[in-house]
């Protein structure tokens, strides 16, 4: 195991929020103020460190006992920065992985940022037919319905009958992002439902949300990701492509990523640990990357509102990008088909991301089960112990 523990200070904006009365704008004095008293004439004790050793051991034990995975790694953050990074097996901190559905939270972040841009004409509650230059049977659905899996458009359960909708999983240069979107909007799928009536995870609805955003902004999807997340957060690797047509062509480097011209919105992103850590921090800092606010607190909160659990058919607690835990209140996660998963504990103020780079899907549920049943409870106990 290779492990590194780093604690970064709060950004100046967050120090301002924490020190409202004192102020952060300077005061014309060159004197360094004395640290605040702890009530007994001394200075405050240093903030206790969280002990990640039990979580590290659980990851190592998992790797030792599972014949499928050669490596696993994870990072934990809070509002102040990266708290802990650990790598196991053949992983390093620079390992780049395909995220599959762990792309969903960053995809929604991009949509929400576009919706909050005063210079853009995009509304997550506006029917997509009012934006797209073509009409179709699903024109009355909204982006909010699309990325909460409540649009009524059949999800991945109907993949076998997707037919022309499979264009969304191709890296063929002849298939354009917008042209595929027109197919998705205009070709009805079997077992379609009214918007807002059923929870049906994944698939064409997510691609339509991305196409609508691109058309509204007159930009490619990756241009939007770079504008609203990549540049302000200083992301080095994170981007979207589309490897689903042939996963074997991925060699673990960003240069091998195909399908950037027809990116898969729900499951096409790649990342390293550091980039995803920065994205998770946005959810803990009130929407900030460093000193730049990329999302409002309201947008962050809206992503966690249960939309999937309030429909009439097949209800499942789900926000926009986040699965909402039934058994662990205040916990949200975004697992992917290969085993990677991101998660957040709203009450305790931490979030994490676990990277997997085995794409056989032989035992892809195992890392997600590990995180949900062992790792998150261990981290919660560690944070609680540090707070006592």
Per-region residue spans from a language model:
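A short, well-structured edge-of-sheet supersecondary motif
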Residues: 59-92, 96-98, 105, 322, ...
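Alpha-helical scaffold elements that line and support the substrate/ligand-binding pocket
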Residues: 80, 98-121, 146, 186-187, ...
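Bacterial Sec-dependent N-terminal signal peptides
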Residues: 19-53
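Penicillin-binding protein/beta-lactamase superfamily catalytic region
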Residues: 222-223, 242-318, 327-332, 337-339
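Active-site-proximal loop and beta-strand segments within enzyme catalytic domains
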Residues: 68-70, 91-201
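Catalytic-site signature segments of enzymes, centered on catalytic residues
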Residues: 85-87, 93-94, 158-246, 263-277
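Short, gly/Ser/Thr-rich active-site loops of penicillin-recognizing serine hydrolases
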Residues: 362-388
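Active-site helix/loop module of the DD-peptidase/beta-lactamase fold
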Residues: 114-158, 211, 215-259
């Amino acid at each position: 195991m290779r492990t590194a523990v780093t604690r970064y200070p709060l950004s100046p904006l967050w120090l301002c929020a924490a020190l409202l009365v004192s102020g952060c704008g300077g005061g014309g004095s060159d004197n360094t103020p004395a640290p605040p008293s702890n009530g007994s004439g001394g200075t405050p004790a240093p903030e206790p460190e969280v002990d990640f050793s039990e979580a590290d051991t659980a990851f190592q034990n998992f790797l030792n006992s599972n014949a499928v995975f050669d490596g696993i790694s994870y990072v934990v953050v809070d509002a102040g920065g990266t708290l802990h990074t650990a790598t196991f097996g053949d992983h390093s901190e620079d390992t780049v992985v395909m995220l599959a559905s762990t792309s969903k939270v960053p995809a929604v972040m991009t949509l929400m940022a576009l919706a909050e841009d005063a210079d853009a004409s995009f509304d997550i509650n506006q029917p997509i037919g009012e934006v797209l230059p073509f009409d179709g049977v699903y024109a009355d659905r909204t982006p909010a319905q699309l990325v909460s899996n409540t649009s009524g458009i059949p999800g991945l359960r109907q993949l076998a009958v997707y037919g022309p909708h499979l264009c969304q999983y191709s890296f063929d240069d002849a298939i354009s992002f917008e042209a595929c979107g027109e197919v998705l909007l205009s070709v009805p799928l079997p077992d379609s439902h009214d918007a807002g009536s059923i929870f049906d995870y994944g698939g064409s609805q997510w691609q339509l949300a991305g196409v609508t955003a691109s058309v509204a902004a007159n930009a490619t999807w990756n241009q939007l990701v770079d504008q609203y997340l990549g540049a302000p957060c200083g992301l080095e690797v994170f981007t979207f492509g589309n490897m689903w047509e042939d996963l074997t062509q991925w060699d673990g480097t960003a240069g091998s990523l195909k399908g950037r011209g027809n990116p898969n919105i729900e499951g096409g992103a790649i990342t390293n640990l550091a980039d995803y850590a920065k994205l998770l921090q946005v959810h803990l800092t009130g929407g900030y990357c460093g000193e730049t606010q990329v999302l409002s607190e309201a947008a962050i909160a809206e992503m966690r509102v249960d939309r999937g659990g309030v429909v009439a058919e097949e209800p499942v607690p789900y926000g926009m990008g986040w699965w909402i835990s039934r058994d662990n209140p205040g916990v949200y996660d975004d697992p992917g088909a290969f085993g990677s998963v991101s998660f957040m504990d709203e009450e305790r103020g931490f979030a994490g991301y676990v990277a997997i780079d085995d794409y056989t899907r032989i035992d892809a549920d195992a890392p997600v089960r590990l995180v949900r049943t062992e790792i998150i409870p261990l981290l919660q106990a560690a944070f609680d112990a540090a707070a006592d």
